Amino acid sequence: MPRPTSTLPKAQHCRAQASDSFQKRFFRFEFVYPKAENIVYKKTPVLTDNVMHYCPGCSHGVVHKIIAEVIEEMGIQDKTIGVSPVGCSVLAYNYLDIDWAEAAHGRAPAVATGISRVHPDRYVFTYQGDGDLASIGCGEIMHACNRGENIVVIFINNAIYGMTGGQMAPTTLLGQVTATTPYGRDAKLNGFPMKLTELLAQLDGTCYVTRQSVHTPANVRKAKAAIRKAFENTRKDKGTSFVEIVSTCNSGWKVTPVEANKWMVDSLVCST
């Protein structure tokens, strides 16, 4: 069979062959396009890109993340106002891209009450530690819950004053060693641990009271569901929702993050 001839001039035909050969050698992947991304996780835009100041192993970062995810999923970023008082979370406004108000030590429920009453269409929540809420702020939280203010209270309980050096808090366990109880908490000297969640659950103004933790992926999901339910209660104007998160403080407890998680499960979770 005769070989097909090219219609190109000889010199032009040689250049075309050379060009084809060059492309085959050096551009063999030219028409291979990447597959579409299969995104399995994406940081919520409600969280800023600021580096958190919390200690490695601290529970605050995880709780910030699930709060931010709930706010995004509910589509309420521009309607949410957080209130943060004195404590490790005093800089929370650097990490969640929502409106924030700062409150004096323990006074976040009072500030949240004022904001909620002036802006009843907003989702108002406080973010407080046990040294803040259960001690100097005990009166504010008791009366806000008793009135049934339409707010969410997120209570981070690590049974110690974390920011100020690891002193005894109202929720410190009996026998627990702190900077101010070097031989362990003694009921005769220091009283018993304050079980604030159980106290608030008995008030008529609270519509939802729960205790959660974030020490395992399963518990993180449960805590997130609890926080979402609390915000949904605000949407329905049901009253005060109180979510306690039993947390770690490895720097205050003077242990490693791994040891802190184990101690929390063995001692704090089981005793609360």
What label would you give each PLM region?
Residues 14, 18-40, 44, 49, ...:
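Flexible, low-complexity linker and terminal segments
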Residues 55-56, 99-100, 128-130, 185, ...:
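A generic structural signal for short
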Residues 5-6:
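Conserved core architecture of multi-subunit DNA-directed RNA polymerases
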Residues 9, 14, 20-162, 225-229:
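Thiamine diphosphate
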